[in-house]
Amino acid sequence: MESALLLPSLLLVAAYPRGGSPQQEWMQSPPAPSVTSAPFWVRLNPELEAVPPGGSAWLNCSHNCPLPVHSSLRTQLRQGKIVNGSGWVSYQLLDVRAWNSKVRCVVTCAGETREATARITAYKRPRSVILEPPVLVGHKYTLRCYVTHVFPVGFLVVSLRRGGRVIYHESLERFTGSDLANVTLTYVMRAGLNDLWQPLTCHARLNLDGLVVRSSSAPVMLTVLALSPASIALASTSIATLVGILLAVGAVYVRKYLAVQT
Ligand SMILES: *[C@@H]1O[C@H](CO)[C@@H](O)[C@H](O)[C@H]1NC(C)=O
Ligand SMILES: *[C@@H]1O[C@H](CO)[C@@H](O)[C@H](O)[C@H]1NC(C)=O
Ligand SMILES: *[C@@H]1O[C@H](CO)[C@@H](O)[C@H](O)[C@H]1NC(C)=O
């Protein structure tokens, strides 16, 4: 009962993908193709695939053409094996290194050509995010956060939080390297009484066009012991006096990493 009721509205959505009220269009103008010939469609699955840098992926291009078709995959990625069945072809894509690669599958059925697209993204979640205990030098604390083995570094944002609130963040978009990287963030701050016993944490976030990957460090504390009487006398809000990002990039590690993967 229910599925019989649902079917017409689903068909309508497919026939009128955009705009207007499908109900009204149904009343005014029923779909042109006869009920027996479904509209020709092409799908490429999955639409978004994530792989480690240098990894490979399989994409399945399927269609509903009852006739023998010509189908091809258009991409800048290197193609590997192909497996096919009736109504589908599965393509292997090799050595995905770009953080974002577009793939199109083009199928021609009885003179009509349609295509479907998919995206493959290569990324590597940081192996570790480590915030060192603050080091007191004079009246200032030096915080160091290490983010190791991350890719693509150009889409990384590293932030420091105190008591859950962001006190500093830096985007590394100026770095366009195509290798795994280590990032060290150094932050120097003054601390006052308010900062005592507040957990400090370091956060790494990759934002890959909708795919967000987050990692964070274990918390560290500013303790009474580290706080000198002189710094209590200083402003109770922290002031950044020097900030730096250090980036180490290792092509060697991409290879090592891949060796571990396979
Ligand atoms: C490809 O997709 C078709 C249709 O969804 C499915 O029947 C087939 O098993 C899939 N092939 C592979 C290799 O996943
Ligand atoms: C798979 O592809 C081959 C070569 O193009 C073709 O001869 C064969 O009919 C295809 N198999 C199926 C089940 O479509
Ligand atoms: C990155 O950090 C890891 C772990 O701390 C270290 O073993 C490796 O040598 C570093 N790689 C580079 C390129 O600095």
Curated annotation (Swiss-Prot):
Cytoplasmic topological segments: 253-262
Pfam families according to UniProt: ICAM_N
Disulfide bridge map: C61-C105, C61-C109, C65-C109, C145-C202
Name listed for the protein in its UniProt record: Intercellular adhesion molecule 4
GO biological process: cell-cell adhesion
Gene transcribed to yield this protein: Icam4
Free-text function comment from the UniProt entry: Adhesion molecule that binds to leukocyte adhesion LFA-1 protein LFA-1 (integrin alpha-L/beta-2). ICAM4 is also a ligand for alpha-4/beta-1 and alpha-V integrins. Isoform 2 may modulate binding of membrane-associated ICAM4.
Keyword terms of this UniProt record: Cell adhesion, Cell membrane, Disulfide bond, Glycoprotein, Immunoglobulin domain, Membrane, Repeat, Secreted, Signal, Transmembrane, Transmembrane helix
Species this protein is from: Mus musculus
Extracellular face residues: 23-231
Similarity remark: Belongs to the immunoglobulin superfamily. ICAM family.
